[in-house]
Amino acid sequence: MDELKKAMKIAFAIKAQNFHWNVEGPLFPQLHMLFATVYEEVYGAIDDFAENIRKLGSYTPASFQRFSMLTQVEDELNMLEDRAMIAELLQDSDKMVKLLKIVFDLSEQAGEHGLSDFIAGRMDAHRKHSWQLRATSKE
């Protein structure tokens, strides 16, 4: 169950929103929109994560302390240059895909096919984020 809770991605969404708010440089318009697309899409799935956790009979994490204990994403306290923001968010998105794959495999083993379907959709969304970030980082 902790793997599913780790996959909720609160910290990832907050980081993408931080980058959306604070990006600067010649790519500002494009990156501002890209980071918004990422954080809005991720935030949009958080309630579904919580409901899937509840369907399995567990309580959802609902405090900053609990989220920080579960996160797989490092907090970014410094203001980064635009290229570093892309690289860091890409690395985190790739981490999320790996974590989601673990959750997918566990849900399949448990016969929780509805959860597997949801997680497969989340993996696809993060692969798309990774692709867009990777393509944006090309010189």
Which stretches of residues belong to each language-model region?
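Non-transmembrane, amphipathic alpha-helical segments
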Residues: 1-4, 8, 34, 85-88, ...
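A structural signal for well-ordered alpha-helices, especially hydrophobic packing surfaces
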Residues: 6, 13-16, 20, 46, ...
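Helix-loop segments that flank and shape redox-cofactor active sites
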Residues: 12-38, 99-114
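Short, helix-capping/interhelical loops that line the mouth of catalytic, cofactor-
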Residues: 22, 59-81
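Conserved alpha-helical segments that form or flank metal/cofactor-binding pockets of metalloenzymes
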Residues: 27-66, 136
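Alpha-helix boundary/interfacial micro-motifs
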Residues: 34, 74, 128-129
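Acidic/histidine-rich alpha-helical segments that form the ligand environment
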Residues: 47, 51, 71-121
